[in-house]
Amino acid sequence: MSTLKQRKEDFVTGLNGGSITEINAVTSIALVTYISWNLLKNSNLMPPGISSVQYIIDFALNWVALLLSITIYASEPYLLNTLILLPCLLAFIYGKFTSSSKPSNPIYNKKKMITQRFQLEKKPYITAYRGGMLILTAIAILAVDFPIFPRRFAKVETWGTSLMDLGVGSFVFSNGIVSSRALLKNLSLKSKPSFLKNAFNALKSGGTLLFLGLLRLFFVKNLEYQEHVTEYGVHWNFFITLSLLPLVLTFIDPVTRMVPRCSIAIFISCIYEWLLLKDDRTLNFLILADRNCFFSANREGIFSFLGYCSIFLWGQNTGFYLLGNKPTLNNLYKPSTQDVVAASKKSSTWDYWTSVTPLSGLCIWSTIFLVISQLVFQYHPYSVSRRFANLPYTLWVITYNLLFLTGYCLTDKIFGNSSEYYKVAECLESINSNGLFLFLLANVSTGLVNMSMVTIDSSPLKSFLVLLAYCSFIAVISVFLYRKRIFIKL
């Protein structure tokens, strides 16, 4: 048993990752499938309402296509994108020429804002973005244990970029976007919860995740399950990181009334990077030190937590200009529900440029981060490190998510999707509705599969069939819960 455990640990150890260009190409399949689904939906060929045909198409696009992108077609992402997009585009053209009916929301038509008062809206492109990320994450956490999953996509040892490294940061970034909804809701209701109430809510939400993290630790240590110590440490894991984020950020909340969250995120990143770079002793400790005490044993989880705090804060900042139904005053960098028109008499040029629509905000911040990240990649003495969540890593994660969100937002603009004309594939909607629970289910299922078979010795065909069955299981559970209106909050 110990020999097999060692083989499995060696299978995911000492890896160097791949290029950012390839990662972008492979993960772009999620955006391409969203575009393809919209093409089919607007072609007048897809059956209306919920049908078995529609669900099969949905599952094929949003689960099978993503599975193919990181297994069989891992080396041919552009070919896979073409094979998916081209038939859907032809179906769209054919449907437009042969159908006499017109869609209720003609694409390319801009819709006027009906509601004047600030409201939080459910945006199709955010659901699609987060759903695609959750599905890809769920697939990858099991696929990484099979030879069919390229080693360059698995988490790197220390320096480098990989698909799974990006997935961890993207999960935190998207959670930041989701958490900004509560901040905007309190602001719109003119509610100011006390520090103690915020701390209690953070403990309540984080406590469940901490319990799951400790439960995972117990099973890993007692069931001879493979572990990668340099990932987070001896006792630490991703659930523990997620559990501590709400509580730690509760202590930052009072400061955010005077200082924007993006400024705090910049401060955290700069101070942390200074600690890493000021002399060699810090990095030597992180890479080479013995694991002879709790702090040293879990140094990756403890130090990288600072980087994840920064990513989470940038996710919150992004939510401020994405989630509302209209531009609000200075929403580019702070939570706001104040109407720009109402404040126009005393607003300045700065107010004009920082009160933005979702697409404008994404374009502005994407451009800023793209320029800064390229400069840092060029002149920084060290490469990206998910292990330490250093500055290059946080910049990479934030830039990627902003750029891809821009792509999703543009897709909605082109196809006329909005909160009034909400069109999102059921697979994406359902996994969003119970995201954290399904992430936990995916982790548990991954453990069960690993204990029931020797994944590293599986043939390509067997690997793919097992992964397809796993995808079907998670997808069916998610849709079942969604149709029954069962929403499990952890």
Swiss-Prot record:
Top-level EC class: transferase
Segments traversing the membrane: 20-40, 55-75, 77-97, 129-149, 158-178, 200-220, 232-252, 258-278, 302-322, 357-377, 391-411, 436-456, 461-481
GO cellular component, one term: membrane
Keyword annotations from UniProtKB, A to Z: Acyltransferase, Endoplasmic reticulum, GPI-anchor biosynthesis, Membrane, Transferase, Transmembrane, Transmembrane helix
Subcellular location: Endoplasmic reticulum membrane
The enzyme's E.C. designation: 2.3.-.-
Biological process annotations from GO: GPI anchor biosynthetic process
Effect of substituting residue 362 to P: In gwt1-16; temperature sensitive mutant that induces a delay in export of GPI-anchored proteins
Membrane-protein topology: Multi-pass membrane protein
Annotated pathway: Glycolipid biosynthesis; glycosylphosphatidylinositol-anchor biosynthesis
Reported effect, residue 397 to I: Resistant to the drug 1-[4-butylbenzyl]isoquinoline (BIQ)
Effect on the protein upon substituting residue 259 to D: In gwt1-28; temperature sensitive mutant that induces a delay in export of GPI-anchored proteins
Cytoplasmic side: 41-54, 98-128, 179-199, 253-257, 323-356, 412-435, 482-490
Pfam families listed in its UniProt record: GWT1
Top-level taxon: Eukaryota
Segments on the Lumenal face: 1-19, 76, 150-157, 221-231, 279-301, 378-390, 457-460
Keyword Transmembrane applies: yes
Function recorded in the entry: Probable acetyltransferase, which acetylates the inositol ring of phosphatidylinositol during biosynthesis of GPI-anchor. Acetylation during GPI-anchor biosynthesis is not essential for the subsequent mannosylation and is usually removed soon after the attachment of GPIs to proteins.
Misc. remarks from the entry: Target of the antifungal compound 1-[4-butylbenzyl]isoquinoline that inhibits cell wall localization of GPI-anchored mannoproteins.
Family the entry assigns: Belongs to the PIGW family.
Protein name in UniProt: GPI-anchored wall transfer protein 1
